Design a protein with these regions (language model features):
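Homeobox/homeodomain signature
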Residues: 1-3, 51, 94, 119, ...
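Short histidine/acidic/glycine/proline-rich micro-motifs that form metal-
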Residues: 50-55, 83-84, 156, 166
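Active-site neighborhood of phospho(di)ester-bond hydrolases with catalytic His/Asp-centered motifs
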Residues: 7-9, 45-51, 75-81, 115, ...
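His/acidic metal-ligating clusters that form di-metal
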Residues: 32-45, 125-185
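Active-site-proximal beta-strand elements of phosphoester/diester hydrolases
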Residues: 2-15, 108-118, 149-151
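A short acidic, helix-capping loop that chelates divalent metal ions and anchors anionic groups
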Residues: 14-19, 86-88, 120-124, 158-162
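N-terminal active-site segment of His-dependent metallophosphoesterases
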Residues: 1-63, 142-144
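Extended active-site neighborhood of metal-dependent phosphoesterases/phosphodiesterases
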Residues: 58-138, 142, 169, 174-183
Length: 185
């Protein structure tokens, strides 16, 4: 049986005086966390799946650290297209790996979380797994003793929404093939 995990994405935290589309991101995120704690106290883990910050500023990540102090769940942070790796690492220095990816075995399921941030793309919003990350994923899937669930900020299959599909994972066909060939996803 798969144990409960929580997935949240696109927090877009900003400095306290800045709204996005008429909403206060920090207030909305805190309300979401309160709801999760009230209605899902049995959740084993919380994955924050990228776009943690709106501008990728250190201040925005510092706001996130303050919020995370009150979260009752073990939490994994992932990066999205609005995040900036150097500023993230300045605030979260205990994340020593080059990419913010890894896996957790939760029950008899391996949850693999990918770092799809592509900081060198001409379209800064699209995602990519460079060859190093593709190799890591292939190896991680091969070594898994359990079925695998894969999490990523950028989607790998066309959604039918043109605006979103323009910023999907650029090498999605390669990644989808690796996932299918593994027989574990």
């Amino acid at each position: 049986m798969f144990e409960k995990i929580l997935l949240m994405s696109d927090l877009h935290l900003t400095e306290p005086s800045q709204m996005i589309v008429g909403l206060w991101p920090k207030t909305r995120f805190e309300a979401c966390l309160d709801h999760a704690a009230l209605h899902h106290p049995d959740a084993r883990h919380l994955f924050l799946m990228g776009d943690l910050a709106h501008h990728g500023l250190e201040l925005e990540y510092e706001i996130l650290t303050d919020i995370l102090k009150t979260v009752p769940f073990r939490t994994t942070l992932m990066l999205g297209n609005h995040d900036r790796r150097s500023n993230f690492l300045a605030v979260f220095p205990k994340k020593p790996q080059k990419f913010q990816q890894g896996y957790l075995d939760i029950g008899r399921t391996r949850v693999v979380y990918l770092d799809t941030l592509n900081e060198i793309a001409s379209n800064k919003h699209s995602g990519l797994l460079c060859q190093e990350r593709v190799d890591w994923l292939t190896d991680t899937l091969e070594r898994s003793p359990f079925p695998v669930v894969v999490l990523a900020h950028h989607h790998m299959l066309p959604s039918g929404f043109d605006g979103m599909d323009q910023i999907m994972l650029k090498n999605s066909e390669v990644v989808a093939s690796i996932l299918a060939d593994s027989g574990k996803c």
